[in-house]
Regions:
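C-terminal accessory "lid"/substrate-recognition subdomains
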Residues: 1-56, 70
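Fold-independent oxyanion-binding glycine-rich loops
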Residues: 30-33, 57, 72-74, 115, ...
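Conserved acidic residues
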Residues: 67
Length: 197
């Protein structure tokens, strides 16, 4: 969802073109110690689309009945073992994705959608949901930070990039969009899409 702020060094575009849906959706949002980077603006936009229910992947909540699942950022690397043990929830998410369910994931949420997550050098590669055919690692972590402009299917979206994690073999899936810094320089961070994920 586009943010409503105009970032420095970017042209004015229709960032206020967001129109709430007439159909009210059921939206499930992961919220617990592993998934807690939740921006108020995202909740405001999602609230305009429908009713929100929170669930906890770390503490083993079932996946709520939903039209959209939002997996925000956080620290899944600190809870990789606990997440790995949530087989029922991970299977429910895989089934949901394969049957066309809509999942919006960013940062830590995307890490949960990969095949595995390795938290440290020499550490265990814990199996995650496996929805995306990628492996995520904190080994060699470095900060990826800055305002971003994304070109996707004729739309321009704006936001920011902030993460330390890396995807092993990021070209295993093609990026569906190009990303640029606020100054217009292309960045290599991919944007992944699989079905409605």
């Amino acid at each position: 969802f586009p943010c409503r702020y105009t970032l420095p060094y970017s042209s004015e575009t229709g960032v206020e073109s967001f129109t709430p849906s007439a159909k009210k959706m059921k939206i499930a949002i992961a919220r617990d110690p592993a998934f807690n980077f939740i921006y108020r603006e995202n909740i405001d936009r999602l609230s305009a689309l429908g009713s929100i229910t929170y669930f906890s992947p770390v503490y083993g909540s079932d996946l709520p009945d939903a039209d959209l699942v939002y997996l925000p950022g956080g620290y899944p690397e600190l809870f990789a073992r606990q997440l790995h043990r949530r087989k029922k929830l991970m299977e429910a998410l895989r089934t949901y994705a394969e049957e066309g369910g809509k999942i919006l994931a960013e940062c830590g949420g995307m890490m949960f959608l990969t095949r595995s997550l390795t938290a440290r050098q020499g550490g265990t590669a814990y199996a995650m949901t496996g929805i995306l055919p990628l492996d995520c690692t904190m080994v060699g972590a470095r900060l990826h930070l800055g305002y971003r402009r994304i070109e996707y299917k004729g739309m321009e979206l704006r936001g920011h990039e902030f993460h330390y994690s890396n995807v092993v073999a990021p070209d295993a899936m093609p990026s569906v969009a190009k990303q640029f810094t606020a100054r217009g320089m292309e960045v290599s961070t991919p944007l992944y899409r699989y079905k409605n994920v």
